[in-house]
From Swiss-Prot:
GO terms for cellular component: cytoplasm. It comes from Saccharophagus degradans (strain 2-40 / ATCC 43961 / DSM 17024). This is Threonylcarbamoyl-AMP synthase. Signal peptide: none annotated. InterPro entries: DHBP_synth_RibB-like_a/b_dom (IPR017945), Sua5-like_dom (IPR006070), TC-AMP_synthase (IPR023535), TC-AMP_synthase_SUA5 (IPR050156). Required for the formation of a threonylcarbamoyl group on adenosine at position 37 (t(6)A37) in tRNAs that read codons beginning with adenine. Catalyzes the conversion of L-threonine, HCO(3)(-)/CO(2) and ATP to give threonylcarbamoyl-AMP (TC-AMP) as the acyladenylate intermediate, with the release of diphosphate. Its main location: cytoplasm. It is found in: Cytoplasm.
């Protein structure tokens, strides 16, 4: 296997990064399920993901990053104790709700004053974010009401008629998606 820090050596990852940069949608494995991703600053791409999933915009989406530094635009003014809490929990399957202060498109945040963020430890997710140069949208690859895809084949069945770029790889060892918590209250939104 090619080390994922050399994403340019993997043609499928190179194509996925190119798709992200051109405003397209990609499908890729994460820690527990396959995800759909795009450039969070491209409202047309985010809208396509919402349409594919039949997901209402008000629910919001997750941003996933390769490193905490990729999220600095959201974290630079956090109190030190909260920044340290994030550092201690990442990389890993911990998604946190943090205030976005208008720094993220409403297409991503939905009706919320917070945005869900995570630093992944999955090598393919990290490589995609590194190649793209920042965080990407991450949401399970399934239409609303159907189970999240666990394989590329299942994603292709769900979205057979859609033009998506597919990363090669398998999901990580987690049986469930990441836990989502509020950074300030520790309230669990999704276990």
């Amino acid at each position: 296997m090619v080390p994922m820090n050399n994403w340019r050596a993997v043609p499928k990852l190179t194509q996925c990064v190119r798709t992200l940069l051109q405003g397209g949608v990609i499908a890729y494995p994460t820690e527990a399920v396959w995800g759909l991703g795009c450039d969070p600053d491209n409202d047309h791409a985010v809208e396509k993901i919402l349409r594919l999933k039949k997901r209402p915009v008000h629910k919001g989406l997750i941003l996933v990053a390769a490193s905490i530094e990729q999220l600095d635009f959201l974290l630079h003014d956090l109190e030190p104790e909260y920044y340290q809490k994030l550092e201690a929990s990442w990389p890993g399957a911990n998604t946190w709700l943090i205030p976005h202060k208008g720094r993220v498109s409403p297409m991503v945040t939905g009706k919320h004053a917070t945005v869900a963020v995570r630093v992944s430890n999955h090598p393919i997710v990290k490589a995609l974010c590194e190649g793209f140069g920042g965080p990407i949208v991450s949401t399970s690859a399934n239409p609303m009401g159907l189970s999240a895809a666990k394989s590329q084949m299942q994603v292709r069945r769900y979205f057979a008629k859609e033009a998506l770029s597919y990363a090669t790889g398998v999901v990580g060892g987690r049986s469930t998606p990441s836990v989502i918590r509020d950074l300030y209250t520790d309230a669990i939104i999704r276990a």
